[in-house]
């Protein structure tokens, strides 16, 4: 395995030293990619080839991005993460770098699969900026939908307890911070009824609670927060247990209590004839030819069948499609209800399209024997079957790996779960993003010391979990290319969240770690500026209050002192109009009336 981080001329050096702006190459991204490729190699026969990867900060984005903080500022992560707390603020972890690291490993493993199929590929290239843009793709689509783009949520206020009212985190009478989750409106109503909140009042909180996945803000009515503060943790736990609501205590410890492997691969049966192909063993055929001018992608000609919902599973299928696979999506009769959630891009939800555009849809009612038989037939004619159902549901449907692999030994069966088997025999919480952030310590790690711990309402583990699931799938495809046999692979939101490096104690921030407010926005200081507060203060002292001058004015003044700074993007729709992002973001057009990031890879 060969690793290259950066490229000369874009603030990177191949010798690992600092670039011209004093910035370091994206070492966290490279470390994550190396970790995942080592884990993949453990599942592959000795000598199996994987491709190489190259990562830099900016990729096709035509602006200077010297570090993680600059990428988060320029690509919208600070904006989306900060929606719930009153304004743009960095994630206190290297989230964009981790996403880029997974993309690099995924691309390199896909290169190996492509080579096994006769493609002349060597290297996958990606960047931290492209990882960040993929991470905000749903929010970008919603902001740019042609049929009335999403209105930015109002800036949340600070509540009586000192916490922002845009977060979903509640505080108990005895001072514990808690996160609750349910996808059932009846369970929601019953939980609050147990806390003496009338249904007419609790119902007002249901919509913002459910929409927080899409909007990254949760303006719950103050009456609900007050009701929680009147009850001790034990009472809240009892109410949650009795009503089927999941509840976890938000710890101030940033370290994960569990550290599962990124994914688990279980080899399929080692002998027997594949009933779909009639041959044994079974591997790959060469990809079908593409029209002149279209790049031949590593997974071209392979078929993925998915039965997924929300973010994690659909994203896994989406990126496999970006790698060239044909993706077939099983939806209930009448279509996935998420298709009609506003804002619409044409006749479909912009957020839904951000993860599902280009997939062929087959409708099947999996609650019926006929629907399950149809799904089985699709799976047994595919290379990959992917789902993110609740634990035990695949077995009840007769669509588990143990059910499908005997009939289709070449199949890769992928389960993307919330918590995997980390809870053992104990009741498992609802497998959603925010509870996974709490369980893995991310709820503490994403915010600096001095701030109350709370999950980011940006869907961090959902996005990362989808990418890790896709990496597990491509690893299993690489194994199949070498052995002719399929596998079952399992990954989870927890296994993805545990990938994000964080210190044993929450990070301490100085004033300059936060974006500086200006007359027309915010400015995020570069690494050299943050390391030299005296130099920054000399510039600021000569210019008055930071709000007295524009972002560009301050950036020029800082540049005159040899200090870099990045304007903080707070208008996602602006990405599609910014010439610097022309090669990274596709603007709305008649065929796709919403903005979306281009593929995060180029292959050589």
Label every PLM stretch briefly:
Residues 67, 74, 324, 358-359, ...:
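Short, well-ordered alpha-helix to beta-strand connector turns
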Residues 444, 448-469, 474:
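Core active-site phosphate/anionic-ligand binding loop and the adjoining beta-turn-alpha structural block
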Residues 372, 389-400, 424:
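Glycine/threonine-rich flexible loop motifs
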Residues 429-447:
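Flexible glycine/proline-rich, aromatic-decorated loop/lid segments
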Residues 356, 372, 376-380, 429:
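A short, aliphatic-rich alpha-helical micro-motif
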Residues 361-365, 378, 459-460:
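Long, low-complexity hydrophobic alpha-helices enriched in A/L/V/I and glycine
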Residues 1-69, 73-335, 376, 405-422, ...:
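Acyl-CoA thioester-binding alpha/beta core of soluble enzymes
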Residues 300-357, 364, 368, 382-386, ...:
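Phosphate-binding active sites in nucleotide-utilizing proteins
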């Amino acid at each position: 395995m060969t690793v290259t981080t950066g490229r000369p001329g874009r603030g990177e050096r191949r010798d690992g030293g600092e670039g011209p702006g004093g910035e370091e190459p994206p070492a966290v991204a490279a470390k994550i990619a190396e970790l995942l490729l080592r884990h993949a190699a453990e599942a592959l026969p000795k000598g199996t080839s994987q491709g190489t990867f190259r990562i830099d900060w900016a990729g096709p984005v035509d602006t200077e991005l010297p570090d993680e903080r600059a990428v988060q500022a320029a690509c919208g992560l600070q904006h989306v993460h900060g929606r719930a707390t009153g304004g743009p603020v960095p994630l206190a972890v290297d989230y964009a770098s981790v996403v880029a690291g997974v993309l690099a490993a995924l691309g390199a493993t896909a290169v190996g699969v492509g080579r096994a199929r006769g493609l002349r590929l060597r290297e996958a290239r990606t960047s931290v900026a492209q990882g960040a843009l993929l991470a905000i793709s749903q929010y970008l689509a919603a902001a740019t939908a042609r049929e009335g783009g999403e209105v930015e949520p109002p800036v949340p206020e600070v509540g009586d307890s000192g916490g922002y009212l845009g977060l979903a985190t509640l505080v108990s009478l005895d001072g514990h911070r808690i996160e609750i989750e349910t996808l059932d409106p009846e369970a929601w109503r019953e939980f609050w009824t147990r806390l003496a909140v009338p249904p007419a009042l609790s119902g007002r909180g249901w919509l913002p609670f459910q929409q927080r996945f899409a909007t990254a803000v949760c303006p719950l009515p103050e009456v609900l927060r007050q009701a929680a503060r009147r009850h001790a943790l034990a009472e809240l736990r009892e109410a949650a247990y009795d009503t089927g609501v999941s509840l976890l205590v938000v710890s101030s410890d940033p370290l994960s209590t569990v550290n599962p492997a990124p994914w688990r691969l279980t080899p399929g049966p080692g002998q027997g004839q594949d009933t779909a192909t009639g041959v044994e063993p079974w591997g790959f055929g060469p990809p079908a030819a593409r029209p002149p001018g279209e790049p031949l992608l590593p997974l071209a000609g392979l078929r993925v069948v998915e039965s997924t919902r929300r973010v994690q599973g659909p994203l896994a299928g989406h990126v496999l499609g970006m790698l060239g696979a044909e993706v077939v999506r099983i939806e209930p009769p009448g279509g996935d209800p998420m298709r009609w959630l506003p804002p619409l891009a044409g006749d479909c939800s912009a957020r839904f399209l951000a993860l599902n555009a280009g997939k062929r849809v087959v409708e099947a009612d999996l609650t019926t024997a006929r629907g399950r038989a149809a799904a089985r037939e699709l799976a047994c004619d595919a290379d990959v079957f992917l789902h993110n159902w609740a634990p035990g549901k695949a077995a009840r449907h007769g669509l588990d790996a143990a059910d499908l692999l005997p009939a289709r030994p070449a199949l890769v069966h992928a389960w993307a779960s919330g918590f995997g088997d980390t809870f053992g025999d104990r009741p498992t919480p609802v497998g959603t993003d925010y509870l996974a952030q709490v369980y893995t310590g991310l709820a503490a790690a994403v915010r600096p010391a001095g701030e109350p711990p709370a999950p980011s309402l940006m869907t961090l583990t959902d996005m990362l979990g989808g990418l890790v699931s896709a990496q597990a799938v491509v690893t299993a495809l690489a194994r199949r290319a070498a052995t002719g046999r399929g596998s079952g692979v399992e990954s989870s939101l927890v296994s993805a969240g545990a990938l994000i490096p964080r210190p044993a104690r929450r990070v301490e921030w100085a004033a300059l770690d936060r974006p500086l407010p200006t007359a027309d926005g915010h400015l995020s200081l570069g690494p050299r500026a943050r390391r030299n507060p005296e130099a920054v203060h000399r510039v600021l002292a000569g210019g008055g209050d930071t709000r007295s001058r524009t972002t560009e004015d301050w950036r020029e003044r800082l540049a005159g002192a040899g200090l870099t700074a990045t304007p903080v993007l707070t208008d996602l729709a602006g990405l599609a109009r910014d010439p610097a992002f022309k090669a990274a973001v596709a603007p709305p057009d008649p065929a796709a009336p919403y903005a979306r990031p281009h593929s995060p890879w180029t292959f050589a």
